[in-house]
Amino acid sequence: AGPHMYNPNWGWQDGKKRNAKVIESFDPTAIVNWVWNKKAGTTLNTGAALRYSLYSSSALNWDKAADPRPDYYRYLPSYFEDEMVQLRYKELWRTNQTSFTQINWDDLYLANANNIRNGNGAAVYMLEERRSDLLETSFNSTLNARMSRHFDITAGVGARYTQSRQFKTVADLLGAEYVLDIDKFAEQDFSGDPDKIQNDLNRPQRKVYEEGIFGYNYNLNI
């Protein structure tokens, strides 16, 4: 598959390399500190901090369709027992046929287009964005006072609050119209129970569009 730095997460689209796994991070932090000397030997040191971190990681998602990852074990020569089939797959990897050894974006768009033509606009393949946003605040204040040559006092207070928001959004429908907010793994085990496959029981069979939240959405408060 070319050099030893093989990366299965990209493929060609419109003559350009497109990566399915893209990580973006934005992490601004503000810190304020105030020192007050009331008198000799007495110091009050107070500080506050605010941090707001945005983190996202994209990935392919699919439902009722072949695994689009080129390094999926069923696409490797070692998966097949038939020697002729093994040789054919070895040749594809050896010659680095990028339509096979890399993500085939054209096939993903085509699968969604065929679904639309069949009267179903739901995405077979899509690109999701996994978000992990963090809000963190802290406050502390420390008093140091010398009462005498042999007696010092140190006292302090501190507080901290953290909220982590975890959710997924639809980054790119790859030509589809929407994605159904259902659990594809639960659908395999409980196909006869429509309630068990829903990600949101309050909104069953919900259609989610680009930039919409789906799958999971919860906060961690510390």
PLM region descriptions:
Residues P8, W12, L44-T46, I116-N118, ...:
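Generic detector of intrinsically disordered, low-complexity, polar/charged segments
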Residues A1-N33, S56-E128, G192-R206:
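Acidic/polar loop-and-plug regions of large Gram-negative outer-membrane beta-barrel proteins
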Residues F167-I222:
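Glycine- and small hydrophobic-enriched segments that form the cores of compact globular domains
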Residues D14-A59, A122-R160, R165-Q166, V208-I222:
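Outer-membrane beta-barrel transmembrane strands
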Residues P70-D82, Q86, S164-D183:
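Small-side-chain secondary-structure face that scaffolds active or pore-lining regions
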